[in-house]
């Protein structure tokens, strides 16, 4: 949604630059989607994020908005720009249609208004206000705290804030088309050497064996391959970028937990997982007795029914390092698609 809003805003006016705030990890991938925009690292609060973005602003005026207000119109943006000389901060406001209770008493709704975004401010004054270190719920409150003048323009009911899952359904009434329906496929491959030991972990199942696995984490190659397949399908890079093997934080890590984090990341970019297929390459141990337990573990991590997950195995006919028992490997394929918000709650099968 951030990308849709950014491109809509870019089409509304000749902005000097459009700055998008995100986490450090998100920005790396956001740039792949839209290199034409500027990016600022987010803070622990909206206010900290705003300060970080303002550090990149050198124009006399700055307009800021919540990325969750996807319905911001060109008319609202133009109203703000036309009024920029009237005050230090121009704010869109809507009248209250409902009765209001405040501290147990009925308030006069005619004296109240609903403030929204975008808000257009004098850059220098907004920066100065935020340096005070106090907490403000929006830009206008910060400007007012240093004596700045606030003026209002008519708000836009369509610029509501997407707060709850059900709010997504309102986008249909604004003419937003459902997301791309194409399916995206990813492929993953991983290998590990054996070492002295008495078990291996495959798809979260601990299996007795006459050897152990040489690895930074728990050496669960099928899960590492599946993570790569999911990241690849979403064009987010590979497992090493998210869980580097030189980071002590992941020393001995439970790969099933890494898979759950991988799923969280992929879903955070708007995707839902369709299915997964894993092939384990090894001479020993025998996989068949453990396939259903593996399948159950993977399905739970992906939030899929087990019939959307497949586990299979093959030997290398005594050829290569796998065939001679030096190690083992795994190949995984995953299919994903964009979550279709027009149909409501995400489908977990």
Residue spans of the language-model regions?
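Conserved N-terminal catalytic core of the sugar/cofactor nucleotidyltransferase
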Residues: 2-58
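Short aromatic/hydrophobic "clamp" motif used to bind/position activated sugar donors
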Residues: 60-62
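Conserved core of the sugar-phosphate nucleotidyltransferase
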Residues: 71-153
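Conserved active-site beta-strand element of glycosyltransferases/polysaccharide synthases
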Residues: 149-155, 160-163
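Glycine- and Gly-Pro-enriched alpha-helical subdomains that act as flexible
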Residues: 229-272
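Short, conserved loop-to-beta-strand elements that form functional interface hotspots
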Residues: 277-286, 290-322
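C-terminal edge-of-domain segments
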Residues: 324-344
